[in-house]
């Protein structure tokens, strides 16, 4: 039984095999045509580069590619694990989307406090999924300031948490190493999606 909101921020150490993490990092580094400066959603629901808020390089994983399929498998493994902890989480009319891979460079990269759900295009986001693709010995934590919780980047670890306003978080600057992560979101289907099905 979940009694406190911080219990919905769940870590799964070593959930994803090292080989998969290495494969994702290799895909990111060799497919530079997909790399862009990290973007954020602004008040107009547009995605823009705002270096005061986020400094990272990220790639959106293309649909119908082997990497997309691998990310989908990782999302299912992650959510299945989450359902063992959060038994009442929804399982119907939900889907995974917005797969991305990013790097926060050593001593440079960060993402200021934010939430992952806003009015507009991200309103259907339910849970965030972060896969840590490498170890960062110093810095680079995902920090939930209002919950007094820091999550250390460790290769193969998955972090899941709700996207709503109760879960503001930020990415600390990695000190010892660059930080590679893959991210995705579990979304509710929109009314339009439900009407079409």
Predicted regions: what they are:
Residues 101-104, 119-138, 186:
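Short, conserved beta-strand element in jelly-roll/cupin
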Residues 110-118:
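Histidine-centered catalytic micro-motifs
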Residues 1-93:
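Non-heme Fe(II)/2-oxoglutarate
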Residues 27-28, 71-79, 126-133, 184-190, ...:
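Short, Φ-rich (hydrophobic/aromatic) sequence segments
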Residues 113, 124-125, 138-197:
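Catalytic core of Fe(II)/2-oxoglutarate
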Residues 89-93, 97-105:
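Acidic, glycine-rich loop-and-strand cores that form catalytic or ligand-binding grooves
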């Amino acid at each position: 039984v979940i009694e406190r909101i911080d219990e919905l921020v769940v870590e799964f150490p070593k959930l994803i095999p090292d080989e998969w993490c290495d494969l994702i990092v290799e895909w990111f580094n060799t497919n530079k045509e997909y790399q862009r400066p990290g973007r954020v959603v602004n008040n107009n629901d547009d995605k823009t580069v705002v270096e005061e808020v986020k400094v990272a390089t990220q790639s959106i994983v293309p649909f119908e590619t082997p990497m997309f399929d691998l990310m989908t498998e990782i999302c299912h493994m992650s959510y299945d694990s989450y359902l063992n902890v959060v038994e009442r989480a929804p399982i119907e009319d939900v889907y995974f989307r917005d797969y991305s891979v990013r790097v926060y460079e050593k001593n440079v990269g960060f993402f200021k406090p934010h939430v992952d759900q806003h009015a507009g295009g991200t309103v259907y986001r339910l849970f965030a999924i972060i896969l840590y693709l490498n170890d960062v010995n110093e810095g680079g934590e995902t920090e939930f300031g209002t919950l007094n919780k820091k999550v250390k980047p460790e290769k193969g670890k998955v972090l899941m948490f709700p996207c709503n306003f109760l879960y503001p978080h930020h990415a600390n600057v990695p000190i010892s190493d660059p930080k590679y992560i893959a991210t995705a979101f579990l979304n509710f289907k929109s009314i339009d999606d439900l009407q079409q099905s």
